């Protein structure tokens, strides 16, 4: 048998999903698993979206335009205007989820061997998309002790060389929940301008900012309009992960032209998903307000509960619906697997994502986990209690 590709062997396993077989086995044993590992909201999808799908009246479910339906893109212009992001429909390309938007950004803007600077910990699939594009991720460390704030500009400049082509940020951040300040965004702008880099900005969690601090989009940064590629998705905003609808947004016509070639090669974004996503823009204002309020309460429940467990520490996330917590364990990969394979308390256990998978620096995140607060408060409270019992019983606990 011929050998599989180097790309295939180097592709990292998802830290979010790699333990799923252990979770499935636990369920088969009758154990209830609290899923804290994945950002799958449990809140209902807007009724207008479900109704739009239910009422589809088409004789043919045809290919949609490769850039997405213009009616949807025109409605998105109004959505972004609410955040003072001024666009035209031509600036927006609809993608099969935010993931495809990231991949197409890399494919359109980077050559094999080009480097992207990414603050770590970072969303694990960025590495997978970089490998797919033949690019290289260079990470700049942020720490839990400093709340995952950005390091000084000099740390970025230490990484910049002739192969550096882009900086990638996620704001608010997955996995940390950190929200970049105006000073930090201006720092990134200045680097992009000074070294003529692309700025890829993943902003899918803009609705979920809990501190009263302003949301500063990469599109708000003056002087680098042609350098910015904005990544977006409806998955988290409307609890629509399964319809796979995202967007790639840029004012740079040359980037859009290159991206469109990849869009045409994959033919079209999902027709039914676009119907649901367009309808979601008409959701009652109470929908997003109630969703926001629910996550505010869940955040408080989770962070207060984590920091009451002996030996556990979590900073207070400012956005998204994740936190990275430090645990008193020797190895979070082993601990998370042990929770699923060897531990249960009163027929229950917890499924978390080991944070090491969100780092590229060897050894980083070894005693950290990412936790998503996408369960109702009653379940979060119980999951935290089960976690505390797991930490008491774990053979590799450290003080």
Which positions does each model-derived feature cover?
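PLP-dependent class I/II
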Residues: 1-4, 8-14, 19-56, 86-399
């Amino acid at each position: 048998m011929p050998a599989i590709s180097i790309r295939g062997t180097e592709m990292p396993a998802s830290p979010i999903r790699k333990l799923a077989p252990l979770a499935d086995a636990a369920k088969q044993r009758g154990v209830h698993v609290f899923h804290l590992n994945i950002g799958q909201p449990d809140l209902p999808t807007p009724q207008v979206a479900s109704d739009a799908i239910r009422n589809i009246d088409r004789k043919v479910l045809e290919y949609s335009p490769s850039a997405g339906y213009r009616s949807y893109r025109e409605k998105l212009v109004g959505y972004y205007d609410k955040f003072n992001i001024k666009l035209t429909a031509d600036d927006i390309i609809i993608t099969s989820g935010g993931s495809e938007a990231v991949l197409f950004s890399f494919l359109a803007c980077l050559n094999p061997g080009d480097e992207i600077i990414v603050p770590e910990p970072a969303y694990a699939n960025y590495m997978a998309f970089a490998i797919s594009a033949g690019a290289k991720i260079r990470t700049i460390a942020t720490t839990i002790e400093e709340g995952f704030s950005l390091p000084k500009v000099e740390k970025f400049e230490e990484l910049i060389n002739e192969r550096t082509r882009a900086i990638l940020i996620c704001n608010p951040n997955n996995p940390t929940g950190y929200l970049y300040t105006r000073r930090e965004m201006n720092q990134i702008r200045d680097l992009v301008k000074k070294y003529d880099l692309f700025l890829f900005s993943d902003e899918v969690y803009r609705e979920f900012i809990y501190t009263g601090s302003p949301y500063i989009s990469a599109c708000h940064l003056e002087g680098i309009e042609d350098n910015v590629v904005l990544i977006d998705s409806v998955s988290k905003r409307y609890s629509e992960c399964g319809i796979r609808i995202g967007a790639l947004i840029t004012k740079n016509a040359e980037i859009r032209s290159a991206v469109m070639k990849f869009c045409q090669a994959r033919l079209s974004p999902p027709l039914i998903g676009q119907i649901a996503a367009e309808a979601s823009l008409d959701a009652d204002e109470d929908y997003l307000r109630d969703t926001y309020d629910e996550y505010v309460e869940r955040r408080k429940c989770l962070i207060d509960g984590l920091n009451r467990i002996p030996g556990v520490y979590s900073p207070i996330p400012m956005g998204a619906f994740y936190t990275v917590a430090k645990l008193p364990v020797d190895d979070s990969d082993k601990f998370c697997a042990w929770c699923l394979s060897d531990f249960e308390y009163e027929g229950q256990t917890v499924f978390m994502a080991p944070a090491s998978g969100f780092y590229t620096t060897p050894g980083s995140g070894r005693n950290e986990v990412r936790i998503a607060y996408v369960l109702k408060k009653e379940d979060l409270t119980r999951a935290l209690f089960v976690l505390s019992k797991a930490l008491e019983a774990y053979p590799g606990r450290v003080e």
